[in-house]
A protein has these predicted regions:
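Non-catalytic, usually N-terminal nucleic-acid engagement modules in DNA/RNA processing proteins
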Residues: 1-182, 296-299
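Glycine- and acidic
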Residues: 151-155, 159, 216-222, 331-334
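Short, solvent-exposed loop/turn segments at secondary-structure junctions
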Residues: 33, 63-65, 96-97, 149-150, ...
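Structural signal for hydrophobic packing residues in well-ordered secondary-structure cores
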Residues: 138, 169, 173-176, 180, ...
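Glycine-rich phosphate/ribose-binding loops and adjacent secondary-structure elements
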Residues: 175, 179, 184-305
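Conserved, mostly hydrophobic/aromatic
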Residues: 24, 57, 92, 134, ...
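C-terminal extensions of enzymes
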Residues: 1-20, 26-32, 41-42, 146-153, ...
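A non-catalytic, amphipathic alpha-helix used as a structural packing/dimerization or gating element
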Residues: 129, 133, 137, 160, ...
Length: 376
């Protein structure tokens, strides 16, 4: 993998760059649609490629390990061939999913024993086998196995958790060196900064992660319930330390406003289920605020979904029609909302990139944050 920094904004820490892997170029800042189980929910790969057009999508190690299983993925020739997606894929390590199974998992030094949400069977994730699983899945960018501390958590827990994440990272690196590639392209490994919402722990973790010298770095354990201002504060502490010549990935973030504020702090990569999940529940994101399409006010609004016409669905259907589809629980409504939201998120980061390159990102960001902070 190669990262080339093209421009840095003069009034903020925002950056524009390119990440080049064997599956193509990723222009940053980038938003990665979440394809948890090998699909971006409700979106054909053709629509994803032609209409939404992301350079990279995300898959989830925990879910892909359970279904379809690594046996099937290896037989298929890896995740790209299995799902017919020839662009970049990033897999998270499953650490967050295991964290979210709090009642059904046990964390110890060796790894995490957890109970499958599907059939109740028991499984063990260790730094070693998670590296093997990710080799078999075959994503272009793979993540370290970490523990995501809950929010809130006390200082001592956060400290113990951070140190264990660092020890697990050493085991990930050692085992990755011994585990050959399965397919005919390279994989890039990102370690993860932890430390909850404690500045000194975030600083300590960022310094340790920076010292590893990986090709890119991630920030985990944020957007787990803490106030947005705390998230920004922790991000600022970490981006000050992480190397400037490597991409920085803020995991699981976030709202359109969260994304712009974190781009301004020097983040390059984002993923979040919000555009797809909220879309399936009738929430649309636009440049002028959010729309709850289920509200009665849209029942006879025959204007197009979004006059900005970012994706073809925006002008193909009216708000009244989309509301009708949700009212009668028609799956097409969820698909339209999902395509719209993902198209908007990709438009937003691409506009951010344009303004970073043009040198006026700070002014544009301030205007957009005000505009988007509305309910229409």
């Amino acid at each position: 993998m190669q990262f080339d920094l093209k421009a840095t904004d003069t009034s903020t820490l925002a950056r524009a760059g390119t990440i080049t892997t064997d599956h193509g170029v990723i222009e940053t800042p980038i938003f990665m649609p979440v394809g948890t189980v090998g699909t971006v929910k409700g979106v054909h790969q053709r629509e994803l490629e032609q209409d939404i057009n992301p350079d990279v999508i995300l898959g989830n190690t925990y879910h892909l390990y359970l279904r379809p299983t690594t046996t099937i993925l290896e037989k298929a020739g890896g995740i790209h061939k299995f799902m017919n997606w020839n662009r970049n894929i990033l897999t998270d390590s499953g650490g967050y999913q295991v964290y979210s199974l709090s009642a059904n998992r046990k964390i110890k030094e060796e790894g995490v024993k957890f109970k499958s949400h599907i059939d109740g069977s028991y499984h063990m994730f260790t730094p070693e086998n998670v590296m093997e699983i990710q080799r078999t899945i075959g994503a272009d960018i793979i993540m370290a196995f970490d523990e995501c501390a809950p929010y809130p958590c006390d200082y001592q827990y956060a400290k113990r958790s951070m140190h264990m994440t660092h020890r697990w990272l050493e085991r990930c690196l050692t085992h990755l060196d011994k585990t050959p590639l399965k397919y005919d392209y390279r994989q890039t490994f990102f370690p993860i900064v932890q430390g909850s919402t404690y500045k000194d722990l975030r600083k300590q973790s960022a310094e340790y992660i920076a010292s590893v010298g990986a090709e890119g770095n991630a920030i985990g354990g944020l957007s787990v319930g803490e106030p947005a201002e705390e998230m920004y504060e922790m991000t600022a502490v970490v981006t000050e330390i992480l190397p400037k010549d490597k991409p920085r990935y803020l995991m699981g973030v976030g709202t359109p406003i969260n994304i712009l504020e974190n781009i301004a702090l020097g983040i390059d990569m984002f993923d979040c289920v919000m555009p797809t999940r909220n879309g399936r529940n009738g929430m649309l994101f636009t440049a002028f605020g959010s729309i709850n399409i289920k509200n009665k006010k849209w029942v006879d609004d025959f204007s197009e979904i979004d006059s900005m016409n970012i994706t073809w669905v925006d002008t193909a259907y009216s708000k009244a029609y989309l509301r009708h589809l949700f009212t009668v629980n028609e799956m097409l409504g969820r698909q339209i909302a999902t395509i719209h939201n993902l198209g908007f998120y990709l438009w937003l980061v691409r506009e951010a990139r344009k303004h970073i390159l043009a040198g006026d990102f700070g002014v544009w960001k301030s205007k957009m944050v005000k505009q988007m902070d509305n309910r229409l």
